[in-house]
Amino acid sequence: MSNFRQTVYMKVLKLLVGGLLALCQVVHAQIDSVFLWPQNVPNSTKPKGKPIITTIADGSTRVTEITDPFFAVFEPRKETKNNKAVIVCPGGAYVRLAVIKEGYSAANWLVGLGYTVFVLHYRVPDAREGAFQDMQRAIRLIRFNSKKYAINPDKIAVMGFSAGAHLAARSGMSDSIIKYPKQDGADEVSGKPNALIIMYPGYLDGGPGKSLSPELKATNNLPHTFIFQSMDDGIVQSSFALASALRDAKANVELHIVPKGGHGYGMTPGNKAAEAWPILLAPWLKEHL
């Protein structure tokens, strides 16, 4: 992308993110947007371009056609900053991203607790392996630039919702082999997170008898993992498959299943599941990250 096009895109991006933040009434300032790939996006046949924002009938905002993946950075206030980081991966079935209710709203809450938050806008639609490359690259970039962000490089969690939870699980439970051509010095550091937050995941029960999907490897050397889902979610088996595999591997896992909530609630006011998980997650994060 030329310098001129990059400048224009950055202006569009600021308007995009700023508009989305206004929609969800985020009170903590975004400080930066960082593109993951300085040159060509690996395994992509699409040119870099601006994403598409749509609003559906229920008022939810979705972003798709992300061809130049990036993360948005949110800083806590100096007096509350705890030097820990959380990368948030919105869901959307690998077709779109629910960036407000599963991205910026969660970021706003986490920043209020003192965490530096990075909302990952990974490639969609239909780019699962590309999204995983984006995930690996984002972790490495953030860890490599830990001094810049004033965070501990060994205190980085990945939080994902729905398809984003599948992506988060892959980041901590796949082999550590880099899945793309090395770009720069950031790709010399570890791409593994230090903790996983798995929110109403999908795609994790693809193994025999609805067991853990084979691309995920459960060992006892895994990040501490928090899992949350509701029993009336049609894909709740994903949480059971993950928790069972982690239990058998004697990994550190905490599973919460509430009776009702459905799927895709994020931090929706009035949804009991949405109101329950922050209460459970806050002390867990404080202890395990």
Regions found by a protein language model. Name each.
Residues 98-100, 119-153, 271-274:
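Catalytic nucleophile-loop/oxyanion-hole region of alpha/beta-hydrolase
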Residues 99-118:
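Short amphipathic alpha-helix adjacent to the substrate-entry channel of hydrolases
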Residues 30-80:
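N-terminal cap/lid segment of alpha/beta-hydrolase-fold proteins
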Residues 82-91:
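Short beta-strand element of the alpha/beta-hydrolase
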Residues 205, 231-236:
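Acidic catalytic loop of the alpha/beta-hydrolase fold
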Residues 137-220:
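Primarily recognizes the serine-hydrolase "nucleophile elbow" in alpha/beta-hydrolase
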Residues 226-229:
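Short beta-strand/loop motif that positions the catalytic acidic residue
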Residues 243, 247-289:
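C-terminal catalytic histidine-bearing segment of alpha/beta-hydrolase fold enzymes
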